[in-house]
Amino acid sequence: FQFNPQTLPETHYLVTEHGNARKAKRWPLNTVFVSKNHASRYGSDQYVLNGLDWESYGAVDLDNIRTRFHFLGKAAWSVKNVSGAIRVAKKAGVELDVLGGNRINFRRGFRWTLSRSIHFHGMVGGSEKTGLLNASRGMIFPVRWHEPFGLAVIESLYFGCPVFSTPYGSLPELVPETCGFLSASASEMAEAVRTNRFDPRACHAHVKQHFSVETMTRNYLTMYQRVLDGETLNAQPPVIQDPARNLPWHA
């Protein structure tokens, strides 16, 4: 992951870059990225959107009575902006499940909030994770960086959860107007959360159509064939153009 080989192999190769480089460095010519925006920030137009094996996620209950919203991500990363998600939930007057972070840090004490309307679940997976997503009204995800892709976003959409996020990185590619709301304003996002006019079935259908493991595999096979045919995917070595972090967030 994020390994940049110093000596290129003699055989045909393809490198997938999944993250945001902190410093400008040259990537191999046959590098692909995980969203159109991600590629463009490296001066490339070569990308394959991620996809997941939805059959492995178990049953989705789109008729379930849903009461809370959720945040899903590495809450300890400041760019994921869990504090912003908590602010939005409080402004909207809704309860929030935080998946991927704990309320207590033994070096820092209580983190983010003591509110009883905010529920921390730590790192979750399996049936615990899918159970929480099946009970969620939507995902609040106000990231402050250019998200390269966002597996948590498509996981949430699969379970019928509209996504309320910032318009950075890949988010406009993943979340159409029928499946969520994008804004860098906490007040605007909170109002969208309050009204929540989105259809869970539309969210579920969107990701099944566009972000399946089968679609991703076909697109990678096309890339592999181009390389095997002697094509060089990028004319110049990709180099990150915009390593921006802490993008605007109006609390």
Question: What spans do the regions from the language model cover?
Answer:
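Conserved donor-binding/catalytic core segment of Leloir-type glycosyltransferases
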Residues: S44-L52, S56-L99
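Nucleotide-sugar-dependent
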Residues: A76-K80, R144-L151, P172-E173
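A short, well-ordered alpha-helix in the C-terminal region of glycosyltransferases
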Residues: F198-T222, R226, L233-I240
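A short hydrophobic beta-strand element within the catalytic core of glycosyltransferases
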Residues: M139-F141
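Conserved acidic donor-binding segment of nucleotide-sugar-dependent glycosyltransferases
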Residues: L174-S187, V193-R197
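Nucleotide-activated donor-binding/catalytic signature segment of Leloir-type glycosyltransferases, i.e.
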Residues: V98-G100, R108-G131
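Short alpha-helical segment that forms part of, or immediately flanks, the ligand-binding pocket
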Residues: T130, V153-Y158, P172-E173
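Short hydrophobic beta-strand element within catalytic cores of glycosyltransferases
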Residues: P162-S165
